[in-house]
Amino acid sequence: MKLIEHFLSIQGEGAYAGRLAIFVRFGGCNLRCAGFGVHLKAPNAKELIGCDTIKAAQCENFDFKDTNFSELKNIIKSHNAPNAIIVLSGGEPLLHQKNTDFKDFLRFLVEQNRQVHFESNGTIEPDFNTLPELKNCYFALSVKLENSGESKEKRINARALKSIFANSKGAFYKFVLSGESDEIREIKEILAIQNGGVWLMPLGASKNELEITAAKVAGLAIKHGFNYSDRIHIRLWDNKEGV
């Protein structure tokens, strides 16, 4: 289980934007999302293309170390932020739900009465029976659309979405849009599978890129009765990592 980074910041997007948060980012993802068009040259000289967390999603191309429960517990304590929510991100953090250290970490957080938020792509069904602590968690579901470059079969798991909304403490959708009208049609198709609150966010990994799509996406949110979420961390710190 690779630990990519951890940091204390504010939640930059979605229903809990602005909340003080400890982010713990794990490596590994079951999607590549080349359609988002972020390019990066890895230390092994491989040219990568994917999303704005490409190092986490394609961590096999980087020299990240394995982590364990003891280290993760100490990380939370080191930030000395008892009122912060805990955001488990990636990559796709649910890839690790069968890992013993991950399970121990989640149990520790729940026992400490921490508010735990998963940032997930919604394609993996949480094992609420084997790991009941997942029922105490919130899920921000960034279900991918056609603009991700992934096939519909890979990016939409109806059973997983239904299970998350039925069993978790809370869940909502957040969609990254370029501002095209077809994206709204796709969102409505997903809501027909499993309804839920929706936050629309502009596509972009930098302030300049956000400026291109933000107004158009906000207009779509207003027109179709959805919520709009800016991406505060990008507005404040541009494409800087670890914030």
Language model: regions and residue ranges:
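Conserved AdoMet/S-adenosylmethionine-binding subsite of the radical SAM
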Residues: 73, 82-84, 94-243
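A secondary-structure boundary/capping signal
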Residues: 25, 89-90
